[in-house]
């Protein structure tokens, strides 16, 4: 076996050149063979054409004895031509099969030569190159360890499954939220003009404070002269000493467990009354009735109790420490 003295890179380049030259030589041989076959086929067609009719003429002469009619002569001639064409077709088929077998043997021969070329090895006498080759073989033998945790690697199937589950949970949560927002609740309030006038209004938990005030205003206009010309934007809703913005929904306060100065803004659980237990450390969760007031009244009386204690609602502000008075 041939030996090659040089670096691994030069050995690879030499192998590449050998394969390239072998491929070019094979292409040239195929081209030459194709040209030769076409030339032979053309000459054979011409020869077969003339030989075919010569043989038919000779056969017709030998088989015709004495006088025959023109129709008999034509019938014999046509029969001989058909028989001769059948024989030529069979002979051509056998010739094509032989050529096909030769091509298959040639292809097998080429594959064998390619295999032998790919099996060529080069003996490298350089110790560094030998070490590199050994290292490359060791690296090539490395495989995947089935015990290694690959959960942190990207996985399209796993990501699609997680996205599907996440979307299902989101839709389930949305449906549950809409169901809660559609539930009705009863809001107790007092129209406050210095004294309380308690009323109740039923609204959905998804309604805004403004929608609640609109309902409250419709029920109070007939009883209070100053409300007949008032609009919703002129009203304020105070709950647990906090002025609630018009754009917030009751659902927002309930889901966030929003608190006023002394207790939750909206809580539907029943707890013991702290006044009965005489324990100032226990919260009484029953919320007070809210107050609906005209903004003009508040501006005139905000320095007087109870308006002096009212503050704008701030979701970031905590009221955990308080005393019940």
Swiss-Prot record:
Pfam families named among the record's database cross-references: XAP5
Modified residues (N-acetylalanine): 2
Signal sequence segment: none
Example of a GO cellular component annotation carried by this entry: nucleus
Coiled coil: none
Lineage top rank: taxon: Eukaryota
Keyword Glycoprotein in record: no
GO biological process: chromatin organization
Record InterPro entries: FAM50A/XAP5_C (IPR048337), XAP5 (IPR007005)
UniProt keyword annotation of Magnesium present: no
Keyword entries, A-Z: Acetylation
UniProt region (Disordered), positions on chain: 137-160
Family statement drawn from the similarity comment of this UniProt entry: Belongs to the FAM50 family.
Name this polypeptide is given: Protein FAM50B
